[in-house]
Structure formats: C-alpha cells, structure tokens
C-alpha cells in the first residue's frame, strides 16, 4: 500500500479528489467514521450553517472562548491563506506533518471505500474526516466550531453530534443543489438541527424562520431567534469595526466593539454572544463579561473586509452572492462615503455575477475585471460585457490587479476593493503580500 512521504504529495492527492465533484449525502462519511472509531462523537461541537456569516460568527465565538481560557478547534472553508488553516487550533493552522499523518491514516480507508457501491469519497468528505480524526485523536480541545461546507442536511459535517447548532443567515446561493426559494434553502440548512439540542439563529426572513422553527419543534430542540428575542441600539461605525449596544433576555452589552468592519458584523458578533450565553446556561463554560468584550474586539477573520494595504487603501472582501454584495455595499457607504471606490472583480461561473456587478456599479468609480486560476472561474471578458459602467477594463491575468493598484498609489481619494469570490481574493492576497 502506497503512503505519502511529503506534505505536498498528500495535499495534491486530496485536491485530485475534486474530480469527483460535490456529492451530497452522508453514507460515505458514516462509513469512514465507523472505521475511524467514530471521532465525530468524541468532540464537543458547535455546528454552524448559513448562507453568509458562518466564518465571522465562528471567529467571534472562538475569540470569546479563547479570552475565557478555553482551547478551541475550528473547521472552516474555503481557506484564504493556506490550505492548513481549514483545521486550526486557537486560530493556528495545524502543521504540515500533522496533515501528512492524517492523510496517511485515511487514504487506505478511502481506497477501500472507492471499491464499494457507495462510490468515491469527495475532496470535502476527506478533509472533513481528517478534521474529526484530528480533534478526537490527535489534539483534543475543549470545543470544536464546525462550519458546514454546503447546505446542512446532506453536508459532510452533519454526521457530528453537536452540543449546540446555529444558522447565521439564509440567502440565494448554491441554488442548483439547495433549491430556488428561501424556504427550500432554509429546510436544507435546518437539517443540522438535532433532537433536544438548542438551535440559535440570526435568520430574519419570516418564510425561512418559520421553516427552521418548525424543524426545531419536530426535533424537540429549544429554539432561539436572535431578532425575536434581542435588540440593537446606538450603532455607529468606528475606524476598525462597529460599535453597538446589544441586549439579550439575560443582560445588556453596552458599547460592544467589533474588530471586524461591516454593519452585518454586528449580527454575527451578537449571534456569537448568544451561543456563548447558551453554552454557559448549559453548564459547559464560565465566561466573564469583560471576556465577551475582549473576544468580540479581538476577533479577526481574513478576507472579510480586510485591509491589506494603506497606500493606496486596499480592502479584500469575499462577498460572492447577492446578499453578501448588499452587505458589502452597506459597509462601504457607512465607512468610506468620501472615497472614490475602484473595484477589482472576479467570480465563479455558477454565481449570479450579473446581479453582483449591477449592485457594485452603485458605488464604483471604475471596475477592473480579471479572471484567476480556478476550474470554475469565469473569463474576465464575459464579466466585462455584463457591466454598464463606462469606466471599465478587463484582463484575464489576475496579476493585472497589482498594476491596477499601483496606478492608484498616489491618489489619496482612492480606495481599491477586491471582491467577488473567496477563491479570487485568496489568490490576490497572496500576490499583494508577496
């Protein structure tokens, strides 16, 4: 049996499984978990689904737990800086040699699974299985914050036995798999709800909220709606984030300050606070008020309205659907109304990029379209044709973003906004920081 001798071989093998595409369903994961001695049942997991806001909510929750002295594992996707960050402990990606060891443990099982009627394991299934094995058998932590990859009901992560579940938001994304309407999409996300396990949600649309609440009632799971039970006031942007007062049924958090910029980050931070309150109520943790404040203030999450350069001002944001783009535009208008906004945009072929471009044109002085090295990336020219803005250019080479930024170097009124895809901003981030 051939095992890998280097990290790069191991990761190349994982990426080669992209050829098997996305195959919703839990049968292969259950098969793998059974043969790995059920690591998914040996961790204290908080399971987070949602169209947008999953990563930021996890970042806030992790930061609060760490401030209170707990060790926290996270499983998130996609990666922004390095592949390793998908499995992290206290914000630190696991080591190359740990990945190599995990892959060598799981590869013989995957080879065996390939020959069964269940069929070949996908890239995401293998990465998810590695995460469960790592947190159960290699590096035990107090809590694991588990982000769904796509949907919820049939997502690979849904073999977990969580102590708490959350849905951040419902919007239009992955509709070919999850359904066209908000209630259909909500039903898929609500598939993470487990019998008797609390579900906390920041979803606000009535039709989606009703579906989630009904599923919780079916499962006899305590149900908490952030927007029905909590209030926001005194909201104002700061230089590095947002300041607001948030009141839950338990207490008031006056003048909370986020370390992440964006009006939507108030909701993500507040959902994290509710998760913390419930973990405390259930007896899992003890957290002081000042640790909540510190955690919210210190949370960081790459690629979410992230400043990567000062001259000219360059921000990266992973907005990749209509709702995400609306939130991004609100953020730019709240924080940078005096700036000339120049957008660098790219997107995947299966995203609603025409609608995203249309929204961006409301705040853009110019748009520069590029493509990037990814199987589903749309061509820059096709994106360019969709725009009605006069000041527009395109280049198929992602490195053209650097020239675009360079040209604005001496313009103090300019702000460069790189957006449209998490995969795209990951590439651009590497280019800029090199």
Residue ranges with predicted function:
Residues 33, 38-41, 67-160:
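ATP-dependent carboxylate-amine ligase catalytic core
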Residues 202-203, 215-237, 258-263, 291-298, ...:
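Beta-strand->loop->alpha-helix junctions that form or flank phosphate-binding loops
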Residues 61, 153-163, 429-433:
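Short Gly/Thr/Asp-enriched flexible loops that form oxyanion-binding sites at enzyme active sites
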Residues 149-153, 160-220:
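Conserved catalytic-core segment of NTP-binding enzymes
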Residues 421:
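Active-site-proximal loop/hinge segments that shape catalytic or ion-binding/gating pockets
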Residues 205-215, 220-224, 313-316, 322, ...:
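C-terminal helical cap/extension that packs against the catalytic core
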Residues 1-50, 57-59, 63-70, 75, ...:
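Short functional linear segments
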Residues 42, 138, 143-148, 154-166, ...:
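Nucleotide phosphate-binding/pyrophosphate-handling subdomain across enzymes
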